Amino acid sequence: MGNPKGFIEIEKKLGGYRPVSERIGDFGEVEQTLDEQDRISQASRCMDCGVPFCHWACPVGSNIPEWQDAVYRGKWDEAYSILTKTNSFPEFTGRICPAPCEKSCVLAIHDESVTIRENECAVVEHAFDLNLVHPNIPKFRTGKKIAVVGSGPAGLSVADLLNQAGHTVTVFEQDNEVGGLLRYGIPDFKLNKGIIDRRIELFVKEGVLFKPNTKVGEHISEQQLMDDFDAVCLACGAMEPRDLKSTPGRELKGIHFAMDFLKQQNKVVKGERIPESIHIHAKNKKVLVIGGGDTGSDCVGTSIRQRATSVTQIEILDKPSDQRMEDNPWPFWPNTIRTSSSHLEGCERRWSLNTRRFIGENGSLKAVEVVKVEWTKTNGQMTMREIPGTEEIIQADLVMLSLGFLSPVHEGLLDRLKVDYDARGNVKANDFATNVDKVFVAGDATRGASLVVHAIRSGRDAALKMHEFVMR
């Protein structure tokens, strides 16, 4: 620790966002950054704790105090080396991770935490700017062939580590571009897709083979996959969306899954044309986002940029507190209210509302009936009841269902492979190995829908088990 009084003398400083009036006019990244000296000053606030709980809270186990100290000393190459020992893609997590590390920072007990996520992003961007990032081409090949199905963060992590181990890795992606959730599920205003392209270009130079527009079971059979490869990793995500199937009016035109909406917009930003007959667009629409999570927030920001007339986001749960509750102490993740850059751009947020029915006219959505709910805890279980007389009509002609995901899609590849599922419908695994010989699983497909950083960790761990398997 170069400055033992840094956390006392220096206040936390963030890069902040571009002005609202500017950023809602495009899909460029909304976050700004600090200059190099400010980054060094922020790194000096890291206290060299006896027990660094930031490291404990980070899903990939990032050695945060070590690389923060390197930043403080201006050793960007050293900081990048430390950072990438545990994280394959700090340029992704440095932009979109909710930073559980900062919530568990020791300084956060009584003050603002050390700046970690933004400094992480600064480290990797400095590394690219200073030409410190080069293709790490394996010095030998083992002769083993690995197939990875899915090119999201888990699949890319698997491919990275197994390629570096000398295996020949082929990644199959059903969409026309590589990246999975990173590419199609996260708006450009949070993650510019050029950042993904930059990493994929490195992978290609390192020898990873990518097969976009290739759906296993259609363009290549499961049997061919099993015959041609020594091991297969299923990294297909958890893409079965939670629906409101039993809600009256669900069939009306104008009700869409959030991911369909976001995926289309990401394609439009890339320059693809969406046929008018299937194009989901919020221009001049009263938009209602059902679901209060990050994906819902992304729908809010996207709708605002598409010039929606109004945007409302509702959540069935109660409004979180501004502060930690007694049963939610540090260093655990705080169950407090979170406000995203999209929320700051102009939307109405409401809580404790359940969707009763969708109201239409001539087959098209016109409004949504909601009702207030009350949550109580009984025998440790939260239960909900509707409050009579609190019914309300919200005008809406475009609804985004952002209710999370149930599991990976079973129909098709997974069912044909005859993998086992757990009680939640995720692919059942023992040390990432499925019940099917030489078939492994990583990421959301086995864990359930979660954070990108968890998918990265899962992919890295799965890669180690796969390496052990093929080298027996």
Stretches found by the model and what they are:
Residues 280-320, 358, 382-398, 405-406, ...:
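Long hydrophobic segments that form regular secondary structure
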Residues 78, 140, 145-149, 197-246, ...:
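Feature captures the FAD/FMN-dependent oxidoreductase FAD-binding
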Residues 5-32, 61-73, 78-87, 109, ...:
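Beta1-alpha1 glycine-rich phosphate/pyrophosphate-binding loop at the start
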Residues 253-284, 364, 376-449:
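FAD-site-proximal beta/loop scaffold in flavoenzymes
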Residues 296-299, 445-471:
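A conserved FAD-binding loop/helix module that cradles the flavin
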Residues 123-140, 198-218, 241-306, 421-435:
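Glycine-rich dinucleotide-binding loop and its adjacent helix/turn
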Residues 3-43, 91, 110-144, 253-264, ...:
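Extreme N-terminal leader/targeting segments of oxidoreductases
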Residues 44-66, 88-110:
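Local cysteine-cluster metal-coordination motifs and their immediate loop/turn environment
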